[in-house]
Each structure stands twice: as structure tokens, then as C-alpha cells.
């Protein structure tokens, strides 16, 4: 969907997702000498398009940048053209015609923001073990809508494959869910006091223990703090410190989602996952080349996949302890934790 006017047909243009009409407007705006700087919306008829000033602001909000616009054609003489060497012409054309598309990871950024906003409205600000586990069903529905929006061919998968993909992804999703928020507030989290940290741990399990099996706050810290320390220091913080840009983070999300190493997937589904992962890896590398990032950054993201997998194993261990202590966890979520996938 065009992030400027809302049109259904959209593609990657000048760094943002837009329809061809808005892309053409954006290009004309910078190549034309006429650049309206004042908003004229109040003087226009009710059903007309927004003025040039407002429309260009929407283009910027969609991520479009004038740096990606090729300069206009100059009127050059035949003599001037003949002076250009064949080698330099070939290199120039090669640089322009090789496409570096990153549509899937670019388009997913906006969808992820909508996904997170929807989750925030449903769950509110309070979070504890029961709320997190209970929300997994809604998270799976929203995740699949996002997947189909970008990879429509997966709508042909059998229900069991769709379900398996989502159930395989949920424990990983819980590991990375807080990474963007953590990255945006990293100084706050680095300087959190001991008392506040312990209070967060206690609040997460408070109220989800049956009255007949309460444990002291001291025991809660003793049992669960090692897990929190692991998630924070071994998973969330290392990824947050990478300062991933939106498309890079979405590449990480999709590489985790389309993990084809599970035995509960059909051969057809595993092949689809394998092919999509190739596309995502290619888009990620292309995006980083366009941004002039160091090549090591690509491999750091691949290493982040291993961090999340380690966090997933630790999380499953924590859930088993919660079950032994009769901490209230959604039964459906515990089925996801228990089932054999490898």
C-alpha cells in the first residue's frame, strides 16, 4: 500500500513505499523549478488532493529521499558525448541498471509498526507472565496477516504448516519483541537501579502464583533473576547495541520466522522457507550496500540469530520452572513450549 496516498498498488521508490503517481510527483517536485512552500489546503475544494507542500511532507514521512533521484537529462552535444570513453560509459550504465530491491524488508517496517501499535492497545501497559503467554494467540493472528501481506504465495500453505510456522516463531518473537524499545531507551536501561530491576522481576510474576503456593520475593529474585540477566545481557542488549535500522531489524525477524530447520514442517513448506530466506538475505545485503555499511554488519545480524536461539532455549527452561511452581501460564502457550519441533 502506498504510504503517501493509500493506493493499493505500491513499490519501492526513492527509499520509500509509494505508488507510481506519488513517486512521479516526488521526482517532479525536486526537478521542477516550481516548489510550493506554503500550504494551500484551506483554499482548495473539499475532495481534492492535498497541496504540494503537504504531499511532499507525506513523501518524507514514508522514507523517500531526494538523494535517490537521478538528475534530469542535460542537452549535450554529439561532440561532448563522443568524448566519453567506452569504459566509463559502461561502468556508469552498470551502476544504474543493476537493481538493489529491498521491498520486503522495507515494506515490513510500516507493517511492524502497525502490528506493535495494535498489540499495545490490546495489552495495555501492565505485563506479567500470564498476560504475555495469553496474548500469544492474538500475536499469531496478527503475525500471519503481516506475513500474507508481504508473501501472498504463502496463503497456499496447508493449515498445519501455517500453524507450525507460527508456533515455532512465538518463543523467538518473545526474545526480540522488546529490542526496538530497548534500543531507543538504551541509556535508561543501562542506568536502571538495583531496586527498580528487582521490582520489575517481582511484578512480572506477582499475582500469577496460586494462593496455596506462594513464594517469597527473595525466592522470586533468586530463581528468576539469572534468566532475566541472560535475556538482557546475552540477547537483548547485544542486538540493541547493533543499532539496527528498521529494514535490518525486519530482515532479522523474517530470518527467524522462516526457519526451515524444524521437523514439524512439510517438505513444501521447508522449501518455501528456504527460498524466502535467500530473498531476505539478498535484500539485506543490498540494503547495507546502498547504505555503505561495513560488510561485518551483515555477519553480525546472522550471529544475532544464534543469540535469539540461545535465548529461546533459556526461555523454554524458564517456562518449565514456571509450570513446576504452578505459576499461571496460558495452557495453549505451554503446549507450544512442550511440543517436539526438532
Curated annotation (Swiss-Prot):
Entry keywords, A to Z: DNA-binding, Metal-binding, Nucleus, Receptor, Transcription, Transcription regulation, Zinc, Zinc-finger
Compartment(s) where it occurs, according to its Swiss-Prot or TrEMBL record: Nucleus
This protein's record includes keyword Membrane: no
DNA-binding region: 1-71
NR C4-type zinc finger segments: 2-22, 39-54
Entry keyword Lyase: no
Pfam family of the protein (one): zf-C4
Gene Ontology CC terms: nucleus
Any GO BP: innate immune response
Family: Belongs to the nuclear hormone receptor family.
Primary role: Orphan nuclear receptor.
Protein name as it appears in the record: Nuclear hormone receptor family member nhr-150
Species: Caenorhabditis elegans
Record lineage: Eukaryota, Metazoa, Ecdysozoa, Nematoda, Chromadorea
Gene: nhr-150
Amino acid at each position: 500500500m502506498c504510504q503517501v496516498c493509500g493506493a493499493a498498488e505500491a513499490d519501492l521508490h526513492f527509499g520509500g513505499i509509494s505508488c507510481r503517481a506519488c513517486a512521479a510527483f516526488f521526482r517532479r517536485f525536486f526537478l521542477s523549478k516550481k516548489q510550493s512552500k506554503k500550504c494551500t489546503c484551506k483554499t482548495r475544494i473539499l475532495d481534492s488532493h492535498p497541496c504540494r507542500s503537504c504531499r511532499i511532507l507525506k513523501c518524507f514521512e514514508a522514507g523517500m529521499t531526494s538523494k535517490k533521484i537521478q538528475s534530469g537529462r542535460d542537452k549535450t552535444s554529439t561532440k561532448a558525448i563522443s568524448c566519453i570513453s567506452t569504459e566509463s560509459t559502461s561502468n556508469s550504465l552498470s551502476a544504474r541498471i543493476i537493481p538493489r530491491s529491498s521491498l520486503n524488508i522495507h515494506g515490513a517496517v510500516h507493517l511492524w509498526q502497525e502490528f506493535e501499535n495494535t498489540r499495545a492497545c490490546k495489552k495495555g501497559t501492565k505485563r506479567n507472565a500470564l498476560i504475555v503467554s495469553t496474548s500469544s494467540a492474538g500475536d499469531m493472528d496478527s503475525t500471519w496477516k503481516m506475513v500474507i501481506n508481504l508473501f501472498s504465495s504463502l496463503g497456499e500453505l496447508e493449515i498445519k504448516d501455517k500453524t507450525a510456522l507460527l508456533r515455532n516463531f512465538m518463543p523467538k518473537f518473545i526474545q526480540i519483541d522488546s529490542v526496538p524499545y530497548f534500543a531507543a531507551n538504551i541509556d535508561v536501561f543501562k542506568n536502571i537501579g538495583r531496586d527498580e530491576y528487582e521490582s520489575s522481576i517481582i511484578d512480572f510474576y506477582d499475582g500469577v502464583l496460586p494462593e496455596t503456593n506462594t513464594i517469597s520475593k527473595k525466592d522470586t529474585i533468586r530463581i528468576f533473576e539469572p534468566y532475566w540477566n541472560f535475556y538482557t545481557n546475552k540477547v537483548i542488549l547485544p542486538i540493541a547495541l547493533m543499532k539496527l535500522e528498521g529494514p535490518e531489524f525486519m530482515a532479522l525477524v523474517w530470518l527467524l520466522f522462516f526457519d526451515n530447520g524444524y521437523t514439524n514442517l512439510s517438505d513444501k513448506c521447508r522449501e518455501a522457507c528456504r527460498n524466502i530466506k535467500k530473498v531476505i538475505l539478498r535484500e539485506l545485503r543490498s540494503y547495507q550496500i546502498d547504505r555503505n555499511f561495513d560488510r561485518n554488519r551483515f555477519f553480525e545480524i546472522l550471529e544475532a540469530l544464534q543469540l535469539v536461539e540461545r535465548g529461546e532455549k533459556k526461555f523454554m527452561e524458564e517456562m518449565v520452572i514456571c509450570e513446576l511452581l504452578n505459576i499461571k501460564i496460558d495452557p495453549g502457550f505451554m503446549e507450544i513450549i512442550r511440543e517436539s519441533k526438532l
